[in-house]
A protein has these predicted regions:
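Short alpha-helical
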Residues: 72, 91, 197, 233-234, ...
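ABC transporter nucleotide-binding domain
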Residues: 175-260
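ABC transporter nucleotide-binding domains
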Residues: 4-9, 14-210, 214
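ABC-family P-loop ATPase nucleotide-binding domain
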Residues: 1-13, 301-308
Length: 308
Protein backbone atom coordinates (compact mmCIF):
# COMPACT_ATOMS: atom_id res chain seq x y z
CA UNK A 1 0.00 0.00 0.00
CA UNK A 2 1.17 3.53 -0.70
CA UNK A 3 -0.03 6.74 0.92
CA UNK A 4 -1.95 8.14 -2.06
CA UNK A 5 -5.35 9.14 -0.66
CA UNK A 6 -8.05 8.23 -3.18
CA UNK A 7 -11.17 8.78 -1.08
CA UNK A 8 -11.71 11.36 1.64
CA UNK A 9 -15.07 11.91 3.31
CA UNK A 10 -15.42 14.21 6.30
CA UNK A 11 -18.32 15.03 8.58
CA UNK A 12 -21.03 13.18 6.67
CA UNK A 13 -24.51 13.86 8.04
CA UNK A 14 -27.81 12.54 6.73
CA UNK A 15 -31.42 12.87 7.88
CA UNK A 16 -34.54 10.95 6.89
CA UNK A 17 -37.26 13.33 7.93
CA UNK A 18 -36.64 14.16 11.57
CA UNK A 19 -34.48 11.08 12.14
CA UNK A 20 -30.72 11.53 11.88
CA UNK A 21 -29.20 8.53 10.11
CA UNK A 22 -25.52 9.58 10.00
CA UNK A 23 -23.52 11.55 12.56
CA UNK A 24 -20.26 13.14 11.34
CA UNK A 25 -18.89 10.06 9.58
CA UNK A 26 -15.25 10.34 8.40
CA UNK A 27 -13.63 7.90 5.95
CA UNK A 28 -10.16 8.30 4.43
CA UNK A 29 -8.90 5.57 2.13
CA UNK A 30 -5.54 5.16 0.39
CA UNK A 31 -4.50 3.14 -2.64
CA UNK A 32 -4.06 -0.52 -1.75
CA UNK A 33 -6.41 -0.40 1.24
CA UNK A 34 -9.47 -2.60 1.58
CA UNK A 35 -11.80 -1.18 4.23
CA UNK A 36 -14.35 -3.51 5.78
CA UNK A 37 -17.39 -1.46 6.75
CA UNK A 38 -19.20 -3.41 9.45
CA UNK A 39 -22.50 -2.83 11.13
CA UNK A 40 -25.81 -4.41 11.95
CA UNK A 41 -28.74 -4.00 9.59
CA UNK A 42 -29.84 -0.38 9.79
CA UNK A 43 -26.49 0.88 11.09
CA UNK A 44 -26.08 3.34 8.20
CA UNK A 45 -23.77 1.36 5.92
CA UNK A 46 -25.84 1.60 2.74
CA UNK A 47 -26.64 5.26 3.39
CA UNK A 48 -22.92 5.97 3.72
CA UNK A 49 -22.12 4.13 0.50
CA UNK A 50 -24.84 5.90 -1.44
CA UNK A 51 -23.49 9.27 -0.30
CA UNK A 52 -19.93 8.31 -1.23
CA UNK A 53 -21.13 7.33 -4.70
CA UNK A 54 -23.22 10.44 -5.25
CA UNK A 55 -26.48 8.48 -5.36
CA UNK A 56 -27.76 10.21 -2.22
CA UNK A 57 -27.18 13.75 -1.03
CA UNK A 58 -25.66 14.38 2.38
CA UNK A 59 -27.08 17.09 4.60
CA UNK A 60 -23.61 17.89 5.86
CA UNK A 61 -19.97 17.10 5.17
CA UNK A 62 -17.96 16.66 1.98
CA UNK A 63 -16.62 13.87 -0.22
CA UNK A 64 -13.52 13.95 -2.45
CA UNK A 65 -12.55 11.19 -4.87
CA UNK A 66 -9.08 11.42 -6.35
CA UNK A 67 -8.92 15.03 -5.19
CA UNK A 68 -12.18 16.00 -6.94
CA UNK A 69 -15.02 17.30 -4.79
CA UNK A 70 -18.14 15.22 -5.40
CA UNK A 71 -20.40 18.22 -4.85
CA UNK A 72 -18.72 20.60 -7.33
CA UNK A 73 -16.90 18.27 -9.74
CA UNK A 74 -19.23 15.29 -9.86
CA UNK A 75 -18.30 14.16 -13.37
CA UNK A 76 -14.56 14.02 -12.62
CA UNK A 77 -15.11 12.39 -9.22
CA UNK A 78 -17.52 9.72 -10.46
CA UNK A 79 -15.21 8.84 -13.35
CA UNK A 80 -12.80 7.50 -10.70
CA UNK A 81 -15.47 5.48 -8.88
CA UNK A 82 -16.97 2.02 -9.38
CA UNK A 83 -20.04 0.94 -7.42
CA UNK A 84 -21.63 -2.47 -6.87
CA UNK A 85 -24.92 -2.11 -4.96
CA UNK A 86 -26.25 -4.93 -2.81
CA UNK A 87 -28.55 -5.87 -5.70
CA UNK A 88 -26.36 -5.70 -8.85
CA UNK A 89 -27.82 -3.44 -11.58
CA UNK A 90 -28.05 -6.19 -14.19
CA UNK A 91 -30.16 -6.26 -17.34
CA UNK A 92 -31.03 -9.92 -17.41
CA UNK A 93 -32.24 -9.96 -21.03
CA UNK A 94 -28.91 -8.65 -22.37
CA UNK A 95 -25.84 -10.64 -23.29
CA UNK A 96 -22.89 -10.12 -20.97
CA UNK A 97 -20.70 -8.36 -23.54
CA UNK A 98 -23.54 -6.08 -24.71
CA UNK A 99 -24.36 -5.16 -21.13
CA UNK A 100 -20.74 -4.34 -20.31
CA UNK A 101 -20.36 -2.25 -23.46
CA UNK A 102 -23.44 -0.26 -22.43
CA UNK A 103 -21.97 0.23 -18.94
CA UNK A 104 -18.64 1.34 -20.40
CA UNK A 105 -20.37 3.95 -22.54
CA UNK A 106 -22.41 5.20 -19.57
CA UNK A 107 -19.15 5.58 -17.64
CA UNK A 108 -17.72 7.73 -20.42
CA UNK A 109 -15.53 5.21 -22.23
CA UNK A 110 -15.20 6.23 -25.88
CA UNK A 111 -17.02 4.07 -28.44
CA UNK A 112 -13.77 3.01 -30.11
CA UNK A 113 -12.30 1.96 -26.74
CA UNK A 114 -15.34 0.20 -25.27
CA UNK A 115 -14.59 -3.25 -26.71
CA UNK A 116 -11.07 -3.23 -25.28
CA UNK A 117 -12.35 -2.01 -21.90
CA UNK A 118 -14.94 -4.81 -21.83
CA UNK A 119 -12.34 -7.43 -22.78
CA UNK A 120 -10.10 -6.24 -19.94
CA UNK A 121 -12.91 -6.30 -17.35
CA UNK A 122 -14.14 -9.67 -18.59
CA UNK A 123 -10.64 -11.13 -18.27
CA UNK A 124 -10.14 -9.81 -14.73
CA UNK A 125 -13.51 -11.10 -13.57
CA UNK A 126 -13.20 -14.55 -15.13
CA UNK A 127 -15.98 -14.01 -17.65
CA UNK A 128 -14.20 -14.86 -20.89
CA UNK A 129 -16.31 -17.96 -21.47
CA UNK A 130 -19.70 -16.30 -20.92
CA UNK A 131 -19.49 -13.06 -22.92
CA UNK A 132 -22.08 -14.22 -25.45
CA UNK A 133 -24.53 -15.62 -22.88
CA UNK A 134 -27.63 -13.91 -21.52
CA UNK A 135 -27.16 -12.55 -18.02
CA UNK A 136 -30.32 -14.40 -16.93
CA UNK A 137 -28.71 -17.72 -17.87
CA UNK A 138 -25.76 -17.25 -15.50
CA UNK A 139 -25.42 -18.61 -11.99
CA UNK A 140 -25.64 -16.28 -9.01
CA UNK A 141 -21.86 -16.32 -8.70
CA UNK A 142 -21.32 -15.36 -12.32
CA UNK A 143 -23.97 -12.64 -12.10
CA UNK A 144 -22.04 -11.21 -9.16
CA UNK A 145 -18.89 -11.26 -11.29
CA UNK A 146 -20.76 -9.37 -14.02
CA UNK A 147 -21.79 -6.83 -11.37
CA UNK A 148 -18.15 -6.35 -10.39
CA UNK A 149 -17.13 -6.14 -14.06
CA UNK A 150 -19.54 -3.25 -14.67
CA UNK A 151 -18.02 -1.49 -11.67
CA UNK A 152 -14.45 -1.74 -13.03
CA UNK A 153 -14.99 -1.51 -16.80
CA UNK A 154 -13.94 2.17 -16.83
CA UNK A 155 -10.79 1.56 -14.74
CA UNK A 156 -11.87 3.37 -11.55
CA UNK A 157 -9.46 4.04 -8.71
CA UNK A 158 -12.06 3.54 -5.95
CA UNK A 159 -14.43 0.58 -5.67
CA UNK A 160 -17.45 0.52 -3.38
CA UNK A 161 -18.96 -2.95 -2.90
CA UNK A 162 -22.16 -3.46 -0.90
CA UNK A 163 -22.53 -7.04 0.41
CA UNK A 164 -20.54 -8.48 -2.53
CA UNK A 165 -20.87 -12.14 -1.46
CA UNK A 166 -24.49 -12.13 -0.29
CA UNK A 167 -26.37 -15.22 -1.42
CA UNK A 168 -23.32 -17.03 -2.83
CA UNK A 169 -22.31 -20.59 -2.05
CA UNK A 170 -18.93 -21.26 -0.35
CA UNK A 171 -17.05 -21.84 -3.62
CA UNK A 172 -18.49 -18.68 -5.16
CA UNK A 173 -17.63 -16.69 -2.03
CA UNK A 174 -14.02 -17.87 -2.24
CA UNK A 175 -13.76 -16.88 -5.90
CA UNK A 176 -15.29 -13.42 -5.40
CA UNK A 177 -13.05 -12.74 -2.40
CA UNK A 178 -9.97 -13.65 -4.41
CA UNK A 179 -11.11 -11.30 -7.17
CA UNK A 180 -11.59 -8.46 -4.67
CA UNK A 181 -8.11 -9.04 -3.21
CA UNK A 182 -6.60 -8.88 -6.68
CA UNK A 183 -8.47 -5.68 -7.56
CA UNK A 184 -7.45 -4.15 -4.23
CA UNK A 185 -3.74 -4.21 -5.00
CA UNK A 186 -3.95 -1.07 -7.14
CA UNK A 187 -7.19 0.48 -5.91
CA UNK A 188 -8.93 1.63 -2.76
CA UNK A 189 -11.90 -0.59 -1.94
CA UNK A 190 -14.75 -0.40 0.55
CA UNK A 191 -16.56 -3.65 1.31
CA UNK A 192 -19.74 -3.10 3.28
CA UNK A 193 -21.02 -6.13 5.16
CA UNK A 194 -22.57 -7.38 8.37
CA UNK A 195 -20.69 -10.68 7.99
CA UNK A 196 -17.61 -10.80 10.22
CA UNK A 197 -15.76 -13.49 8.20
CA UNK A 198 -15.85 -11.14 5.22
CA UNK A 199 -13.71 -8.63 7.10
CA UNK A 200 -11.36 -11.32 8.37
CA UNK A 201 -10.82 -12.64 4.87
CA UNK A 202 -10.49 -9.36 2.97
CA UNK A 203 -9.91 -6.19 4.91
CA UNK A 204 -6.67 -4.42 5.77
CA UNK A 205 -8.73 -2.09 7.97
CA UNK A 206 -12.17 -2.22 9.47
CA UNK A 207 -14.70 0.32 10.62
CA UNK A 208 -17.79 -0.37 12.72
CA UNK A 209 -20.91 1.77 12.31
CA UNK A 210 -23.65 1.76 14.92
CA UNK A 211 -26.77 3.90 14.75
CA UNK A 212 -25.05 6.12 12.19
CA UNK A 213 -21.89 6.71 14.21
CA UNK A 214 -18.35 5.40 13.72
CA UNK A 215 -17.66 3.49 16.93
CA UNK A 216 -14.39 1.86 15.82
CA UNK A 217 -11.82 2.37 13.05
CA UNK A 218 -8.58 0.39 13.16
CA UNK A 219 -6.22 -1.81 11.11
CA UNK A 220 -7.35 -5.40 10.77
CA UNK A 221 -3.85 -6.69 11.49
CA UNK A 222 -4.42 -6.56 15.24
CA UNK A 223 -7.31 -8.99 14.79
CA UNK A 224 -5.32 -11.58 12.82
CA UNK A 225 -4.32 -14.08 15.44
CA UNK A 226 -3.57 -17.73 15.92
CA UNK A 227 -4.28 -19.74 19.03
CA UNK A 228 -1.61 -22.42 19.48
CA UNK A 229 -1.05 -25.06 22.13
CA UNK A 230 1.94 -27.38 22.53
CA UNK A 231 2.91 -30.30 24.73
CA UNK A 232 6.19 -28.61 25.73
CA UNK A 233 6.18 -24.87 26.45
CA UNK A 234 8.35 -23.13 23.83
CA UNK A 235 8.55 -19.73 25.53
CA UNK A 236 7.46 -16.35 24.21
CA UNK A 237 10.85 -15.48 22.68
CA UNK A 238 10.89 -18.59 20.51
CA UNK A 239 7.35 -17.92 19.31
CA UNK A 240 8.11 -14.26 18.58
CA UNK A 241 10.98 -15.35 16.32
CA UNK A 242 8.59 -17.15 13.94
CA UNK A 243 8.16 -15.40 10.59
CA UNK A 244 5.04 -13.23 10.50
CA UNK A 245 4.49 -13.14 14.27
CA UNK A 246 4.39 -9.61 15.69
CA UNK A 247 3.11 -10.21 19.22
CA UNK A 248 2.89 -13.16 21.61
CA UNK A 249 0.36 -13.32 24.45
CA UNK A 250 -0.09 -16.11 26.98
CA UNK A 251 -3.64 -17.38 27.46
CA UNK A 252 -5.25 -20.08 29.61
CA UNK A 253 -5.50 -22.29 26.51
CA UNK A 254 -1.97 -21.78 25.23
CA UNK A 255 -0.59 -18.85 23.25
CA UNK A 256 -2.17 -16.14 21.09
CA UNK A 257 0.04 -15.07 18.17
CA UNK A 258 -0.74 -11.77 16.45
CA UNK A 259 0.39 -11.96 12.82
CA UNK A 260 1.04 -9.33 10.15
CA UNK A 261 -0.18 -11.34 7.18
CA UNK A 262 -2.52 -14.20 6.43
CA UNK A 263 -3.03 -16.45 9.49
CA UNK A 264 -2.62 -19.52 7.27
CA UNK A 265 0.97 -18.55 6.38
CA UNK A 266 1.83 -17.96 10.04
CA UNK A 267 0.23 -21.29 10.97
CA UNK A 268 2.47 -23.07 8.49
CA UNK A 269 5.56 -21.26 9.81
CA UNK A 270 4.59 -22.17 13.38
CA UNK A 271 4.10 -25.83 12.44
CA UNK A 272 7.53 -25.98 10.80
CA UNK A 273 9.20 -24.39 13.84
CA UNK A 274 7.30 -26.61 16.28
CA UNK A 275 8.25 -29.81 14.49
CA UNK A 276 11.90 -28.74 14.21
CA UNK A 277 12.08 -27.88 17.93
CA UNK A 278 10.03 -30.86 19.11
CA UNK A 279 7.40 -28.78 20.91
CA UNK A 280 4.61 -31.29 20.22
CA UNK A 281 1.75 -29.45 18.53
CA UNK A 282 -1.64 -29.95 20.17
CA UNK A 283 -3.63 -27.13 18.55
CA UNK A 284 -3.32 -24.54 15.78
CA UNK A 285 -6.48 -22.51 15.40
CA UNK A 286 -7.31 -19.04 14.02
CA UNK A 287 -8.53 -16.98 16.97
CA UNK A 288 -11.07 -14.36 15.94
CA UNK A 289 -12.86 -14.00 19.26
CA UNK A 290 -11.48 -10.47 19.63
CA UNK A 291 -13.28 -9.17 16.53
CA UNK A 292 -16.56 -10.83 17.40
CA UNK A 293 -16.31 -9.69 21.01
CA UNK A 294 -15.49 -6.13 19.97
CA UNK A 295 -18.34 -6.02 17.46
CA UNK A 296 -20.88 -7.28 19.97
CA UNK A 297 -19.56 -4.99 22.68
CA UNK A 298 -19.85 -1.90 20.47
CA UNK A 299 -23.22 -2.68 18.89
CA UNK A 300 -25.24 -4.01 21.81
CA UNK A 301 -25.85 -3.43 25.47
CA UNK A 302 -24.37 -0.68 27.58
CA UNK A 303 -21.46 0.08 25.28
CA UNK A 304 -23.77 0.67 22.34
CA UNK A 305 -25.98 2.94 24.42
CA UNK A 306 -22.97 4.96 25.51
CA UNK A 307 -21.71 5.26 21.92
CA UNK A 308 -25.10 6.49 20.73
Amino acid sequence: MNDTVLLAAHGLVRYYGARQALFDVDIVLARGEILGLLGQNGAGKSTTLQILCGALAAHGGRVEIGGHALASAARQAKALLGYLPEIPPLYRDMRVDDYLVACARVHGVAANAAAQAVARARQRCGLNDVGARLVSHLSKGYQQRVGIAQAIVHEPQVLVLDEPTAGLDPAQIRDVRELIRELGRERAIIVSTHILPEVRALASRFMILHHGRVVHDAPASGMRRLRVRTRHTPGAAALAAIAGVTEVTASPRGWLLTVDGEPEAAAEAFAVAAVAAGWGVLEIDPDFDDLEHLFMELTSGAAASAAA
